[in-house]
Amino acid sequence: MIMLNIGPFSFHSRLLLGTGKFPDFDVQQKAIDVSEAEILTFAVRRMDIFDAKQPNLLEKLDVKKYTLLPNTAGAKNAEEAVRIAKLAKASGLCDMIKVEVIGDDRTLLPDPVETLKASEMLLEEGFIVLPYTSDDVVLARKLQELGVHAIMPGASPIGSGLGIVNPLNLSFIIEQATVPVIVDAGIGSPADAAFAMELGADGVLLNTAVSGAKDPIKMAQAMKLSIEAGRLGFEAVRIARKRCATASSPLEGMSVVE
């Protein structure tokens, strides 16, 4: 498969895995291992990265194996998002940041105005910027025009497991994209992840679908395989849909039985 390129980074895996809500560190580590994800995302606000006495994910991981993608979850405006991003960078983490500015507490949908503003501010600060956005086609284009390094449209509300509720909009975002499109939020099953990849997405970021599964380790492996299968299917190019049947067996050269 073709590698996933984000800014100066290249990755074999197209699965980006969130690290929250796992039952314990052991299950989390095993799920990460079997997923073969190379990018791990986490909320800076949920982790006291400056307190050596506070156990956290970074102590348990061989961080040299992964690219860490801190996110600005909890930010309500652009200024808060920038402040969180700078905190992550000051701690020595990767300067790649997932911009997450929530505008509605019920749906957890992003604030489009503040997301645009935060992305612009962080680009000026030299960050590699990956904004979480809705499936708004125009907003995705405006973010792209700013110079962000990837677009991360949600398939459906965060943690809902509803899958891709608006494949048409998602396909429009993918068709106009000049940067990677990583489907983020709402994925519930391996079929959802495969569908996103078949639409032409460059990657899938998920968390709850794995951490909330009855068997997170098996689900992590299932997601890995479904994303690989979906991408291979996209690269292979599926047959055209037709209204009528087409025989799959050749008719030429067949003997006629009387």
Curated annotation (Swiss-Prot):
UniProt entry tagged with the keyword Transferase: yes
Active site, UniProt feature: 98
One Pfam family recorded for the sequence: ThiG
Similarity comment: Belongs to the ThiG family.
Record's function text: Catalyzes the rearrangement of 1-deoxy-D-xylulose 5-phosphate (DXP) to produce the thiazole phosphate moiety of thiamine. Sulfur is provided by the thiocarboxylate moiety of the carrier protein ThiS. In vitro, sulfur can be provided by H(2)S.
Keywords: Cytoplasm, Schiff base, Thiamine biosynthesis, Transferase
Subcellular location(s) of the protein: Cytoplasm
Quaternary context: Homotetramer. Forms heterodimers with either ThiH or ThiS.
Pathway: Cofactor biosynthesis; thiamine diphosphate biosynthesis
Domain of life: Bacteria
GO process terms (BP): thiamine biosynthetic process; thiamine diphosphate biosynthetic process
Record: residues binding 1-deoxy-D-xylulose 5-phosphate: 159, 185-186, 207-208
Broad class of enzyme this protein falls into: transferase
Entry protein name: Thiazole synthase
GO molecular function terms noted in the UniProt entry: thiazole synthase activity
Catalytic reaction equation(s): [ThiS sulfur-carrier protein]-C-terminal-Gly-aminoethanethioate + 2-iminoacetate + 1-deoxy-D-xylulose 5-phosphate = [ThiS sulfur-carrier protein]-C-terminal Gly-Gly + 2-[(2R,5Z)-2-carboxy-4-methylthiazol-5(2H)-ylidene]ethyl phosphate + 2 H2O + H(+)
InterPro entries: Aldolase_TIM (IPR013785), Thiazole_synthase_ThiG (IPR033983), ThiG (IPR008867)
Protein source organism: Bacillus cereus (strain ATCC 14579 / DSM 31 / CCUG 7414 / JCM 2152 / NBRC 15305 / NCIMB 9373 / NCTC 2599 / NRRL B-3711)
One GO cellular component, as annotated: 2-iminoacetate synthase complex
EC number annotated for this UniProt entry: 2.8.1.10
